[in-house]
């Protein structure tokens, strides 16, 4: 019997930092399972979770302010390895008798720390440069206003900068560590090695969390959960539902039926590609509901983006329900819920990130649906879902395809949605994406798409003036989709794409490129 992949686990306590999920992703990339819980987790819950070690993440507040978050006191009596990052280090120092003060120099961005103690800690055999006095130097990323100004009893300084003499600390006899910088961001060049030292050498975790083992574990869980029952999955062609389809098919074969709703708002040939991939190549039972007319007639005359989204959502449920009703004795509904959905859903209910196991319904499902949920990806981050997709044999270009909104082209056609507009947009978008692939830039940008503007602009063909529609192109670069900058594509490429769209698609006289960053603009136009 292979070892339980959840048995060597790390607990991450969240103090509200934007980097908390990134810490969890880094821990898992190293091959160790972890979960995120709020900072005020009870002692009973911590003991039940039974971690090999605890990471106290960062947070936006100041330890010096009354009522700011604190780590559970029980942690300091449990003999568990602890790693405090940024705010996590500060609250650890303060709670154990050290002192934290506001700094008159905010450290934000790149910094160099000098290693004062490297043996038996996070920094053993790790360096980027060597200082004049022979001590190792590390390139790191800082983001803090406060700093630790007096060590708690039993701690020593392990790294320093000129403006933060206590940039890292460690206990002389216990496996407790604090760093003022962020090892989880790529700007801290040796960050992964530091985390690996903490997880593997200090906490003693085995690196069991790998795509192959995750798939084995998920298959076992699904088989135990659904037995011989039938399972229904709404297949969109997006990454999450595609990976769920491949995973469930491997686990339960013909007990799975997928319903693919073609709403007329998909990308060029997307419906046929989904059917070829899943029904033809993989032998999965897929029912295709051709509901283009239904969607377009309900959207007729509607200009408001929010109402368009709602109409598309409600119509999807109507069509899906009608197809589901034709399939007898289905007990389970599969969903592509992933871990960030679970965290966000819990945070919306409680004001903070919460537990994986609490029941999470992504919303939009009818109240009277008498099916139970099976969500095989609910423990996984998006990058893990992609790796599992590749491991299951899905093509790279499908797994690493850019995000596509749920309402599809419905929110990339400004104002009213018409079949004519959708057809023009599909062709324009396909040319844009094809040329990005040809220039080997598709996977270098995070998202790229065309937008249909329902305004007519004057153009000249031969000697004749003509008034035709405008296409906007949007391409962005981002790490987390919370902020994004417009992609600086080569002018020659933009010229080529523009010429092709105007010459090959009747009805378009002008192409523009969107140079807005997020914020203030959003990535999608609607």
Swiss-Prot record:
Give the pathway listed in the UniProt entry for this protein. Purine metabolism; GMP biosynthesis; GMP from XMP (L-Gln route): step 1/1
Q: What is its EC number?
A: 6.3.5.2
Ranges of residues in domain GMPS ATP-PPase: 209-401
**Record function comment:** Catalyzes the synthesis of GMP from XMP.
Q: Which InterPro entries match?
A: Class_I_gatase-like, GATASE, GMP_synth_C, GMP_synth_GATase, GMP_synthase, GMPS_ATP_PPase_dom, NAD/GMP_synthase, Rossmann-like_a/b/a_fold
Question: How is the subunit organization of this protein annotated in UniProt?
Answer: Homodimer.
Q: Where is the active site?
A: 86, 182, 184
Name it: GMP synthase [glutamine-hydrolyzing]
Note one Pfam family from the annotation.
Answer: GATase
Which amino acids does the record list as binding ATP? Answer: 236-242
- Which reactions are catalysed by this chain? XMP + L-glutamine + ATP + H2O = GMP + L-glutamate + AMP + diphosphate + 2 H(+)
Q: Which residues form the Glutamine amidotransferase type-1 domain?
A: 9-208
**One GO CC term on file:** cytosol
Question: Which organism encodes this protein?
Answer: Hahella chejuensis (strain KCTC 2396)
A single GO molecular function term of this UniProt record: GMP synthase activity
Keywords of this entry: ATP-binding, Glutamine amidotransferase, GMP biosynthesis, Ligase, Nucleotide-binding, Purine biosynthesis
